[in-house]
Each structure stands twice: as structure tokens, then as C-alpha cells.
Amino acid sequence: MKSSRFHPEAIVFGISIALLATTTTIAAAQAVATTEANKVAAAIQEEKRLEALALQAEVKKVSRLDELAATREQLSPLELKELLSLVGFEGKALKEAWAIVMKESTGRPKSHNGNANTGDNSYGLFQINMIGGLGEDRREKFDLKQNSDLWNPVLNAQIAYHMSQGGADWGSWGIGPNAYNGGKAGSYYKWLDQYPEGK
């Protein structure tokens, strides 16, 4: 029978191996955690960068809208297209909105038709009619202090965007199935053909 001898070196060696394995596992876990933390930090940085870019774009948009609002004589065809796009019109609705403005005011923000015989007291780019009770309702609905507020081209276009449901219903301008005049559009189609595509 062999006598068992106590070998402290073997125990120390075993403990050292176990500690080394544990240290390696901890180091690997720390490396994974560091990598994940770096990924999260990078994602947060990217999100902040995108938010900053979106904010810069919004500031530029507001600044450009302010510039266009200061225009009082006549918007060029491209300025008009830009303004309508900035307030939300897009695609087919943008083209239709552009043609309607050209038909109604030829891009002149201070246009006014005060001919009560034709049922008009219409203002601005889209010639928004403010005659009689219609004016009272619209002043209240759109928080207008006076009809001449509609000479602001941005405000006028924003109200037209709302009235037309984003360009889906041009009935108030005599275009389409909901038109007050049965859809006779007159010069609308002439202007539609002159829309500045791709510019």
C-alpha cells in the first residue's frame, strides 16, 4: 500500500491554474463589456449627431420661411415651389398647389380681389376668400387678427395646406370633384403644364 503524501506544490499549482482561468474569464468579460459599452456610446453619439443635423435643417427651414415671408412683391416660380414644399406639399399635391397659386395670384403675396359682386374678398397667394361669415369663421379658426394677415405668403400657404387637407382636396379653389363650380379649372391646366419640374 502506497502512502499518500501531501504535495503542497500541486495544490498551489492547481489554485494558480484556477486563478489564471478565472482572471482570463474576467478579462474576456471585461473586454466584451467594454466593446458593448463602446458600441452603445457610438450609437448615442450617432443619435446626437443626427438630432443635431435635423435641428440644423429645421433652423434653416425656419430661416428660409422667414426670408420668403418677407417677400411682398412676387415670388419667382422656383421660390414659390420651394415655399410650398417647405410648408408640406409634396409630389402631385405640390405641383397642383403651384398651379393653383399661379392661377389665383401669379405668385404675388399681396394679391387681393375685393369684388363682392363675384362673392370675393380674397387674399394672398391662394386667394383665400374672407367674404362675410366665411371671413369670421376663418379668422377664428386660423387665429387671424385681420384679413391682411393672409398677405404673409407662408401663413397663406400653411392655411391652404390645412384647407386642402395637404393637397388632397382642392374644392375650395374650384378644382376636382368637391369644387364649388363643378370643377371648371380654367387656366389651372395651363399653369400645371408650366410647373418647374426637377429644378
Model-inferred region functions:
Residues M1-Q56, K60:
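N-terminal secretion targeting segments of exported proteins
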Residues H7-I11, N117, P153:
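Hydrophobic alpha-helical transmembrane segments of integral membrane proteins
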Residues L20, A42, E47-G107:
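Export/targeting segments at the very N-terminus of extracytoplasmic proteins
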Residues D66-T71, E82-G88, H112-A116, F142-P153:
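Second-shell loop/turn segments in exported
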Residues E96, N115, Y123-K199:
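Catalytic and binding regions of secreted/periplasmic enzymes and modules that target cell-wall glycans
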Residues V101-S105, N113, M130-G132:
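Generic secondary-structure microfeatures
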Residues M102, T118-G119:
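Flexible glycine/serine/alanine-rich "lid" or loop that lines and gates the nucleotide-sugar donor pocket
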Residues R108-K110, G171-S172:
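Paired acidic/hydrophobic, glycine-rich loop segments that form the ligand-binding mouth/hinge
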